[in-house]
Amino acid sequence: QMQKGEEAAFARGVSAAALMEEAGQGIVAVVRQFYSIAGSLVIYLGKGNNAGDALVAARELRKDGWKVFGRLCVPPAEMKELPRGHFGDWVEVVEDARKQVFAPGPVVLLDGLLGIGFSGEMKADIAALASEMNDLRQHQHAHIVAMDLPSGLGARHAVEADVTACVAQIKDVLVEDGADRNVGRLALVP
């Protein structure tokens, strides 16, 4: 579904960079809607465009006073070109967010690990980061915001989001039987 929408946008002359900026801004609106007080934002980044969406959102939320931490599955140099261009030293990279001492306020984990092209089982490094997110949610009261789909939806160790922000449309897989455990509340980003 989403890939067809992106292809249509590209056919109209919209660039991938503009789509990423638009998606990131939409994620910002969702975070502001559910978490009105700035706190700590941990962005979980894969190497693809979902990471870029998360970085755009984090850049803007930082302006609101959010402290931004990053958990990376690959070094920034190994990210695709577009997300790599949004990465900067304003992201405090941490080795294990479970050991991080967060400032007062909400702790929001932004799931930018896997995008709409994922299927099958997650690789071990991604599964470990997804498990870390779930641990923080269960044991430290962190809140998970997924973008489009919770990473690994349908796989073991999938992210268990509190909110899934759907860019452009709600994907069919999000409303299938059993998905509610991972999807949480749905928020549409127009």
Where do the protein language model's features map onto the residues?
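A near-ubiquitous, low-amplitude feature marking generic local secondary-structure context
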Residues: 2-6, 10, 44, 70-73, ...
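Residue-level detector of flexible, active-site-proximal loop/helix-junction positions
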Residues: 9, 75, 100-101, 151, ...
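General N-terminal targeting signals
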Residues: 14, 19, 85-87, 176, ...
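Positively charged, low-complexity intrinsically disordered leader regions
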Residues: 1-37
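YjeF_N-associated NAD(P)HX repair module
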Residues: 3-4, 105-190
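Nucleotide and nucleotide-moiety/phosphate-recognizing core
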Residues: 28-115, 121-147
